[in-house]
Amino acid sequence: MITGHNKFTYDFHLADHSGLAVKDMGETDYENFIKEFANFPWLDQLEIANRLKNTSATITVQDSRNRTELWTSIAGNRDNHGYIVGYNFPKTIKGNFFRKERTVKWVIMYATEARDKIINCYNLFFKRDIKGLILEFEQLYFYGETEAHIQNFKPRV
């Protein structure tokens, strides 16, 4: 395991009524994370999310050293589904008029049906190969980008 400020941690954001149930899973490395990713009940969580509306299942890995996150959510239905992959990172926004420059949490999102592409994104993320990760993203469908919402409240499961 990587320790201190160089560690990776991850959590499961489960489909639930409030859409806020987060199960912190603790520290991880690439091999252990990929096992958890493969064993996550994606389709069961997708069905719950579709029943409840306005919620989704998401797995997020945080890199404490770079203050970045890579996450995956599922959308669609059991027979026809895909994934949204998001990369959160600090981005400096230039000020306009009298506003100063500021750093925000930014997210870029991509869509894919190919789990092997997602696995490769996580491999590059754990290696901290950001250039390689961006190149891998460019092979996916660009879904959008925006300032990320910071959630201060995480109920524990």
Region annotations inferred by a language model:
Residues 26-38, 100-138:
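Ampiphathic alpha-helical segments that act as solvent-exposed interaction surfaces
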Residues 2-67:
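Negatively charged, low-complexity tracts enriched in Asp/Glu with abundant Ser/Thr
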Residues 3-24, 66-113, 120:
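Intrinsically disordered, low-complexity regulatory segments enriched in Ser/Thr/Pro
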Residues 30-39, 72, 85, 153-154:
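Generic hydrophobic, helix-prone segments enriched in Leu/Val/Ile
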Residues 134-155:
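Short, highly charged C-terminal tails/helix-capping segments
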Residues 3-6, 153-157:
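Aromatic/basic-lined ligand-recognition segments
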Residues 63-68, 130, 146:
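Short alpha-helix boundary/capping elements
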Residues 42-45, 49, 130-134, 145:
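Residue-level signal for secondary-structure boundary elements
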